[in-house]
Amino acid sequence: MTYTLLRPLLFLLDAETAHTLTLDTLGLLQKTGLLPNRTIYCTPVRAMGLDFPNPVGLAAGLDKNGAYISALARLGFGFIEVGTVTPRPQPGNPRPRLFRVPQAEAITNRMGFNNVGIDKLIENVRQADYQGILGINIGKNADTPLQNAIDDYLICLRKAYPYASYVTVNISSPNTKQLRQLQNETELEQLLGALKTEQTRLSDQHGHYTPLAIKIAPDLESAQIEAIASLLLKHRMDAVIATNTTIARDGLEHLPHGDEPGGLSGAPLTERSTAVIRQLAMHLQQAIPIIGAGGIMSSLDAQAKIKAGASLVQVYSGLIYRGPALVSEITSLLCSRSTYAG
């Protein structure tokens, strides 16, 4: 009810200003003890060798710098993913770079991995009092040539490894030039090989295993999805997140901000991302868990992704349009046996 009243006021503001204001307010409420803790009980879901207290996670992008983990943890998520973070701080693309398309319940962003850098993010993670499952989403700096991208991912992996429950490798944002080329078979083969080798070394060094997930785009042909699935199996990756934002604009061109460059999320992405999950599930045959993301605006959207083959789901744009109550709404449905029984 509270968010229903607040949303029209927030939507009067520039989208990025509203985003920052909302997070700052949550952080203040948490620090002053005024933010209630929503504990949502569920049969734990086991994936990546981890026991998730419920299957609904926060997608990367909302808390890029890990500065609001303690506050977001009180909203009832089963896990939280922060980032995308890069080795060095970078400002991202010029503003405005975040746009709502309310008529389509969509958001377009061309943020460009704006973040404070991996060292500061880790400092924030260490200061948070969150004890739950935390994913750290890593990427490459905008000025790093594609041929050196592996180095950026390895730098971030090494620094995140001791503090993350799992690490997500973002190779699918449309807002960093050439990044999506890392999904091509040759480039992905090299990247996954380097990541697994380093993961093994870090596991020996730290005495524990931190899983690796790969986040892919929704704008892939069937043959590309099959090739990616084959490489994920070959390199024994721990999970795949499907999907990131889309560059498609089908039916939105006539709407205000509907044709803004960048990645589109929200309701127009729902079916596209679920279709990718379905194809991945067919190729992976439950050997690697799928985390479903993209256009989850209701509990039924989340259920559709589970039925398509996902083990867990993540939300972001749905929170902007529905508010925090969406988390408990989805969890209530997904925790019923019928969802996982098919």
Swiss-Prot record:
Substrate binds at residues 64, 109-113, 170, 175, 244-245. The lineage of its organism: Bacteria, Pseudomonadati, Pseudomonadota, Betaproteobacteria, Nitrosomonadales. Its main location: membrane. The keyword Cell membrane applies. InterPro entries: Aldolase_TIM, DHO_dehydrogenase, Dihydroorotate_DH_1_2, Dihydroorotate_DH_2, Dihydroorotate_DH_cat, Dihydroorotate_DH_CS. FMN binds at residues 60-64, 84, 137, 170, 215, 243, 266, 295, 316-317. This is Dihydroorotate dehydrogenase (quinone). One of its GO terms (cellular component) is plasma membrane. Belongs to the dihydroorotate dehydrogenase family. Type 2 subfamily. Binds 1 FMN per subunit. It catalyses: (S)-dihydroorotate + a quinone = orotate + a quinol. The active site is at residue 173. Keywords: Cell membrane, Flavoprotein, FMN, Membrane, Oxidoreductase, Pyrimidine biosynthesis. The gene is pyrD.
